[in-house]
Amino acid sequence: MATTSTSNMSRNGGFCGALQRAPPPMPPTLIRRLSSRECYGVGKVKVMLRVADRDRNSGGTEPDFMALDKKKRQVTLTDPRTACPPPQAAQERAPMVAAPKMFAFDNLFTGEDKQSDVCASALSEVIPAVLEGSDGCLLAMGYPATGQAQTVLGELGGGSGSGSASGSGVACSLGAAPCAIAWLYKGIQERRQKSGARFSVRVSAVGVSATKPDALSQDLLISHAAESDDSPGIYLRDDFLGGPTELRAPTAERAALFLDSALAGRLKSSGSTASGSSGCAAPLESALIFTLHVYQYSLSRKGGVAGGRSRLHIIDLGGCANRNGGLPLSGIGNILLAILSGQRHPPHKDHPLTPLLKDCLAPITCHVAIVAHVRPEQSYQDALSTIQIASRIHRLRRRKHRVPMPLAVGLAQGLGGNGSSAGSGADPSSSEISADTVIYMGPNDDATDGEHPPVYLPSLTAGDNRGVMSKALKGSGLEKPPSKSASNSPMMMKKAMAAEKAKKLPGSHTGSLKRQAGAGACSSPMIPHEQPQIQAMGSPIPIPRHMVSKGSMVPSPKGSPMRRAHPGAALEQLEAGMRKITEEQWIDGPRVSRAKVAEARHLMREVNHVKQCETWVDGPKSQSCRSLTACNLPAAGGSQTQGYGFMDAHKKTMIRQWVENQTTQVFQSTVSASNSPTALHWKLSQLKQKSLDLPDRPAFNPEPSLDLNQPCFESLPLLDPAPPDGDEDEDSGPSEVPPALPLLDDPLGSRDISQDNLHRMLSRHVSREQLHEAELVASRASSSHHPSQRSIDCGLQVTEEEIARTMSRDRDHDPSAHPLSALSHCDNISFVSSFNMACESFSECGERARQQFDQLARLHEIFTSQLAMAEVTPSAALFRTDIGSVFSEPVYHFNVGQSSVCSEPAYRLTPSPPKQPSHSPSQGSLPSLNGIMEIAGMDDYALLRQPDGASDPNLQKGEKRFTPQHDDICELDEKSMAAAVGKGNSLEDAQHKLNEITNILPLAAQSRLPLLPLNTSSEAYDSGHDSNSTPRTSKHSGISRRAESGYHSVATVRDSDESSFASGMSKGQRHRITVSGTGAVTSAGIGNYQRQCHKKRHRQDQAGNNKGLCNWLLTPFSCTYPETEGEISDF
C-alpha cells in the first residue's frame, strides 16, 4: 500500500499537482456556514464512524457480527460466539443470553459513501471555526490497516472505492488533508474580499514513531527551514513542543507541496512491520500531525487592530495503536478522554504523543472531529474496543451541562462539603461494564443508552413515576421555584414599598436623590421583615443593619466601598434574601429611579439653581451649606461631631490634608500676586473705582482694614471646625462654587484716570488735622479698652533718626514718654515674636499700624493719579529736540546707590495714541505735591519699618550725593522744558518735590509704584534701530558697548516691560550724549562724553587685571574682558 501511494505521488506530482489540476469543489454545507458566520464559542466534539468494505479476496467464512443502520446512524454488535448456540445450550442458558450492543454516532459512513461526502461532513464545522479565530482538529483513529490513510489522504488514482457507481475524477478521491487545504484557502479569499482582513498561513508537520515510545517527535519539514523566516508563533507558543518549523504558504499549492514533503519524510521514518488482523504484512506508519497556522488581523471600528492566531490540525495516528511496543488503542482512548474532559494530568504522559495531542485538543474553544475506523475483517474484540472508545467520547460530548441552580442550593452544597467536582474524569472501569451499566435519558425521554434495547425498570412503570424521574434527572424541578401567593409576591411588595416611599418623600427638590430614597426607606414604618436594628452613637433613631458598616458604625449608602459584601456574610445575606425581598436593588449601580434622574437633570440645567442643602465635600465649606439628610443625627453629649457620613477616618484625613494643601497653595499664589506691581496697581484701581461709585464716606472709619491683602483672605476656604451634620453622598449634585477671580489682561498703560475723577477723589479726602485728631481718639480708645494691643511686636524696628524725629515732634509732651522708656522701667519683658506667619503681624500690630497701611494705600492712590496727570502733549519744541529718542523722558533722582538693583521702576510707554487730544495740563502746571502731602496726611509714614541699619531717608545727604553729578543734565533739561512750556516752574522743583515723596515712601512701596507712561503718542517708542536722533555707531565703538552691555543696557530698559535695572544715574549719562534735532552736539555733552570715555578706559584696564570669579560677583555687569571687548553681552 505504501509503495503504491509512493508511485502515484511521484507519477502525478503529488497533492500539489492534484490541487493545480482539479481542486475539490466546496460542499454546499460549508458554503452556508461560511456565509452565515456563526459565533463559535465553546468547542464541540463530533464523533463519526467509518466502516470499510469487506475485502473481496478474503474468504467469507467469518460470521457477520456487525449490523449498520445509516438512517438511525446506529451500529449493532453481536458476539459471534453466542450468535448461533445449540438448542440444548440455548434452553439451559436462556437467562444468560447477552443482548446485542447498539451504539449511536453523529454520522456513519460505509464503503458506498463518496470520499467527498466524508470530508465535507468532517470539515463542515472545523474550517469555519478556524476562520472565526478558534482552533480546529480532525483526528483519525483505529487499528492499523483500517482505512485511516484513506480518510486523511485519499487516493491519487481514478476511483474512490468499490461502491462508486461511476468512475469519478481525482477530485472525488482526495482525502481530508488536501480538501482542508483547498477549502481553507477558498474561505480565506472570500473572507478577505468581504471584510478586508489580512491573512498569513504557515505550515508545520510533526511525526511520532509508532514502535519507539522513547523516541522524540520529529520535525518533518526541517529540511525547508531555510526557506522561511522566523514564525510569529514563537511569540505565542507556551507548550511542550519546543517550536516546529513553520513555513510560509501563500497559496494552497504551496501548502500541498509541504504536505507531500512531510509524507515523504514520514515514510522514511517507519521501518518495522507487523502482521495485521487480516494476515497480510504491512508497515507501521508513524503518526502524522499536519498543522495549518492562520494569522489574521483586521482594523476595528474604533481604530484598533483585532486578530490573532488559529490552527487547523489534521492528525493521523497511523500505526501507533499496535501491540508491538506501541501504545494500545485503549491507552489512546484514555488520553483523549482525559484531555477532552479537562484533566490536567492525562495518562501516559511519558509518551511523545501525549503532549502533542494535549497541545492540539486542550483549548476549550477547539472544535474536534474524530473519525473512528473499523473493518469487518477485524476480530470482534478489536472492533468492539474501537467502537466503545468512540462511543465514550461521543457521550462525553453529549453530556448535558449542569443546570444553573439557585444560590441557596449552591451554597448549601458548597458549605456541606458533599458537592461533586466541576468535571468528572474518565470512567476507570472497563469498557464492558461501562457499556452495560450506563443509562441516560434520550431526547424523547426514552430510557435507552443507544447501545441496548429500551430497559424498563419496575419502579418507573407504575403511574407517572417515569415522568417524575425524567424531570428529576434533567433538573427541571430545580429550575422553577415554588410559587407563592399573590399577596406575598415580590412584585406586590415592591409596589407597596414604592407607594410608601412616595408618601414619605419630602417636598423639597434640592436634596440628593439617594438621600431621599434612603429617607423614605428609613422612615417607612411598614417593613415586611424584621431587620436587626442598631443605633448610632448616642442617637435615639434606629437604623437598619444593612445600612451600617461594621468598621465605622456610621450609616453608609449602598454605593460606598464599605457596603461591599464579603464571603463571611454571604450566608447571612442569603438567608435574609430567601425569607423576603424588601425592595428592588440595582446591583451594579445606584438605586435611582428614572423620574428622579429626569428631575435631577432638569434642576442641573437651570442657570440660577443652587442647591442650598448640600455640602461640597472636597472643597470649601460654609455655615450656610449644611446638608439636611434624612439621617441627621445629633452628636452624643455635644462632644462628638458628625463626620462625612460613610467616609471613614482615613478618607476624612485625606480630605483634610488636601484642603490644607490647596489652602497653602492659594495663599502663596495670592500673596505673590498681590505683592507684584501689576496686582497692586489693579487693586488700587479697583479701590479707586469703588470709592468713586460709593457715596461720601464719613471722616473716619473706626475699624480700618488692610485693603491690599483682603482678597487673599477672601479666597481662602472657610475652615469650620465642626463638619456638617448628616452624611453626604458621593454622587450628589453640584453645590455652590465661589466665582472665579477676574483675570488681569489689560496693560498698565491703558489705565487712564480723568482729571475730574481725581479732583472728586481729592475733595473726599479728609484734611491732615482731622485725620490726626481721629488717630489720637482711636489710639486712646484702643489703649483704654485693649491695653495689651499697645505692645507692638519687636519686629517693627526703628532707627535713631526716627526716634530723634519723634522726640522733636513731641517736645511739648512728657519727657518720660520716650519710645524706649519701657525698656528701662520694666524688669522682665518677654514678648512672643510673630515672625512665623505674615498674617499674624497684621493682627498684632494694632490699630495704629493698620491705619498707617491704609494711609500708605491712599498715598499710593493719590501719587498714581498725579502721575497719570503727568501725561502731557509735548509741544513743537519738544518734537524738534529729541522727542523720538528713548532719552527724552525726564530725569528723576532717587536716594539710592549707584549699584542698587532696586533703583527706580521702569516706565511703560502707552501702547496706542489717544484718539482725542489730551486735556491734561503740562508738566509745568502740575499741582503742588507738597499740598497733596498735606491733604493726605502722610506725616506719620516715616514711622514705618525700614531695613536694619538704614539711615533716615529725609536726610539731605542723599540729595547732595547725586546733585553735583547732574548739573549739566539739569541745565539741559531746564532749557528744553523752558522752551516747551514757557513757565517758571523748572525741572529741579518737580524733582525736589518728587524726592520728598520718595523720602516719605518706604523702599517697599517705591518698588510697587505703577509704570509711568511717558507719552500718549505711539511715535515715542523707540526700538533702538529706527531712531534718527540716536547716534549711529559701529559695533565695536565705546558708545555701543556702553549702551548694550550689562547693567546699563538700553535694550534692558526699552524691551522689558517691567524692568527695574535702569538707574537714574545711567539715564543721566545717556542724556549727556543725546544729539539734538539739528545734529549738533552740545559742548557740555561732548565734555561729559570725553570724561566718560576716559573713565571707561580706566575701568577696562582694571578689568583686564581682575578676571577672578569674586570680582565678577561683586561687579557682574561692568566686568568686560579685552578678548570679548567687541561682542555684545546681554543678560
Curated annotation (Swiss-Prot):
Chain segments annotated as coiled-coil in the UniProt record: none
InterPro entries, sorted: Kinesin-like_fam, Kinesin_motor_dom, Kinesin_motor_dom_sf, P-loop_NTPase
Stretches for region Disordered: 1-25, 472-494, 693-753, 905-926, 1016-1072
Keyword flag ATP-binding: yes
Record field: compositional bias (Polar residues): 1-11, 1016-1032
Biased composition (Low complexity): 483-494
Broad class of the protein's primary localization: cytoplasm
Top-level taxon: Eukaryota
Keyword Nucleotide-binding: yes
Keywords, in A-Z order: ATP-binding, Cytoplasm, Cytoskeleton, Microtubule, Motor protein, Nucleotide-binding
Domain Kinesin motor positions: 44-396
Pfam families: Kinesin
A molecular function GO annotation: microtubule binding
Any Gene Ontology CC annotation: cytoplasm
Record's subcellular location: Cytoplasm, Cytoskeleton
SMART domains, per the entry: KISc
Recorded family membership: Belongs to the TRAFAC class myosin-kinesin ATPase superfamily. Kinesin family. KIF26 subfamily.
The protein's name in its UniProt record: Kinesin-like protein CG14535
Organism: Drosophila melanogaster
